Amino acid sequence: MSSSRSGEHRRNYAQGRNYESSRSRGDQRDRDYREYRRNYRDERSSRRYEDSQRRDYSPARRRDRYERHRESVREESPRRPVEHERNWQPELKHGRERFRERDYEGRRDRKERRDGVSPFSPEGEGLERKREHEKLQAPSPKEEEERPVDQGDKMDGVKEDKDGSLEVGKSHDAMTRTKSAEEEIVEQEDEATAEMKRIMGFSGFDTTTGKKHGDVGQVYKQKKTKYRQYMNRPGGFNRPLDNE
């Protein structure tokens, strides 16, 4: 049986039989699909599929689409300051302080809008004028650092009268009254504790450590060391023994 199979194989090889592989079939299938897509026309637009794909993915169309996207994003997002604009110092204010003040004003305006106060209403105009007045009246940080410190600021609770005499302030009087009240409370607690100990008989008890006395009620014991003799230890018999 094996000889018949080998003979058939030799005959087929001699005749030049074409064995089609699966790879060739797959390539033919891909070519048929590409041909079908090339000749396919859309029913709604009546245009070829390949033409629409070529136009959608062309470099010019991609560039236009990217430019439109950039313009839309630029319009939506607010402009952020550049590095040299952040460090720009208008007048005496540093760039960071200026932007910090701008952020504070933005949060304040949002809070007013949330509370219902419109900047165009009479109340809003009054608040705006009040803020401008406070800005003009408030000293700058450099002026506060350069301003000398008065001696009156250092004296806590002391003020000068018209005639030149010094009067103790209310804060100093309040602190003195508080301290005296605390001392009185402590003294009252000590007196109450001593009275309770005296009534219950605890006031006569005290420690007897290190005291010499002859009272029978008080005990003071002094322990004396005694040595024992060990026969199985070297030098045990040389130790002096107690006289018993």
Curated annotation (Swiss-Prot):
GO biological process, alphabetically ordered: mRNA cis splicing, via spliceosome
Name of the protein in question: U4/U6.U5 tri-snRNP-associated protein 3-like protein C162.01c
Ranges where the record places region Disordered: 1-192, 223-244
Location of the protein in the cell: Nucleus
PANTHER family: U4/U6.U5 SMALL NUCLEAR RIBONUCLEOPROTEIN 27 KDA PROTEIN (PTHR31077), U4_U6.U5 SMALL NUCLEAR RIBONUCLEOPROTEIN 27 KDA PROTEIN (PTHR31077:SF1)
GO annotations of cellular component type: nucleus; U4/U6 x U5 tri-snRNP complex
Keywords: mRNA processing, mRNA splicing, Nucleus, Phosphoprotein
GO molecular function ontology, one term from the record: RNA binding
Organism: Schizosaccharomyces pombe (strain 972 / ATCC 24843)
Disulfide bridge positions per record: none
Pfam family, one: SNRNP27
Domain of life: Eukaryota
Residue stretches of biased makeup (Basic and acidic residues): 1-11, 20-116, 126-182
Subunit comment: Part of a tri-snRNP complex.
Residue stretches of biased makeup (Acidic residues): 183-192
